[in-house]
Amino acid sequence: MTSLDALVTALGDRLVTDAATVTAYSRDSSRAAPEGDAVALVLAESTADVSAALSWANEQRIPVSVRGAGTGLVGGANAYSGGLIISLERMNRISWIDPQNRLAQVESGVVTAEFDAACREHGLFFPPDPASAKQCTVGGNIATNAGGLRCIAHGVTSDSVAELEVVLADGRVMRTGALTRKNVVGYDLTRLFIGSEGTLGVITSAVVRLKPVPPGAPRTFRASFDRLEDSGAAVTAIMAQSSTPEVLELMDSFSVEIVESFHPTGVAVPSGAMLVGQTVGEDAEEQANAIVQLCSSMGANETEVSDSDVLLEARRRSNPALNARGLKISCDVGVPIASLATAFEGIEKIARRFGRRVSTVAHAGDGNLHCTVDAPDSAEELLVADEIIDEITKWALSLGGTISGEHGIGSVKHHELSWQLDSVAIDVHGAIKSALDPNGILTPGRAI
């Protein structure tokens, strides 16, 4: 039995061993990945707490899982048996907001939507906008390089990060990046840690880039189609225009049906799929009308433009609605925009071949698709759901896509790595991991 005496001395009541409390922090939102029985939980309140915890774990060769808000979907934050959990939820301070330079320093445990609201008091906003923004944390967004609804206009999380504070596996603390727009000093360590899913170090704070809130009132639009592939073709056409929306999402008929049964919004279930999006700026109304007119010319049978957020709220509720149905297996694939219609055709063929319904929601404007299959509590049905999602993932790869657009790899997608990365790339990843975490304590067996 490993002695926790040194950690108790360093952390006091911030070290928790109560079994019920530890269990509550032992997994993320994925139901398809198992968790272990950790020996203790660190409720870190400072970088020094994280440093002490990692220094101890490294000396003891104890595996560490790192947790923000637990909204991840790939088992990346799940506990290890005999391991240590480090929770960053108490590191929830916004250190400063600098409107002149459009920068802010924030600790990793700050909830994304709350941080965005604080920035808006200064006429600015934080660009990353995951569907779970009201629950997820800035640190979690950085660790997975999260995307979200506004990606097509503002990029992924890495495009909004200037500096990081990172605690390495041995407890040493380092800073990466610079406040300036240009910085070519040394390797780009900031981007190395972004999206590393806790395998290279624990991100404790960041300086992030903000943008000014667009003038005028945003406009929301909807276009419904009889066929899923027609909606994909419309997305390709929309994104080829000189002016594109800030948000462009897709929900197929099954996903709208699921959301409406979970939390009715009054949104009509389309025959095939619907596009929902948002335009911003003083010409938002003009932009939205142009988009729905384009959609109508490409087969949309029903369109609308409004100032209501109901449509986007329905999209944000898709994952909670799916979770309410029970165990599910999902993917997070990405495909080139021009291949969306082909991707949807393939997904429908796979679903028909297996005789199962597949729900698809997408950050359509950047080609990021989330396909989900219900997996009832039987080993046989779970295997079928896994096989369907694997087929969809391989189909996306055949179109020049990726196995993960924003959720990360964690443990759920670990078996897919070799489908996308060649052996040399995997060796390079391993070399980087060994250099920064020679004892392999940081989320071992996940991400890479």
What residue ranges belong to the model's regions?
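Activity-critical C-terminal alpha-helical subdomain
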Residues: R172, H414-I448
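FAD-binding subdomain of flavoenzyme oxidoreductases
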Residues: R93-E249, I441-L442
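Active-site nucleophile and cofactor-binding loops and adjacent substrate-binding regions
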Residues: E45, G68-A69, P128-T137, H363
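N-terminal flexible segment immediately upstream of the FAD-binding catalytic core
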Residues: M1-S55, G72-R102, S253-P264, S306-S330, ...
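N-terminal accessory segments
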Residues: M1-S30, Q60-I62, L294-V310, S398-I403, ...
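C-terminal substrate-recognition/cap domain of FAD-linked oxidoreductases
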Residues: T17-R27, P212, S224-E391, W395, ...
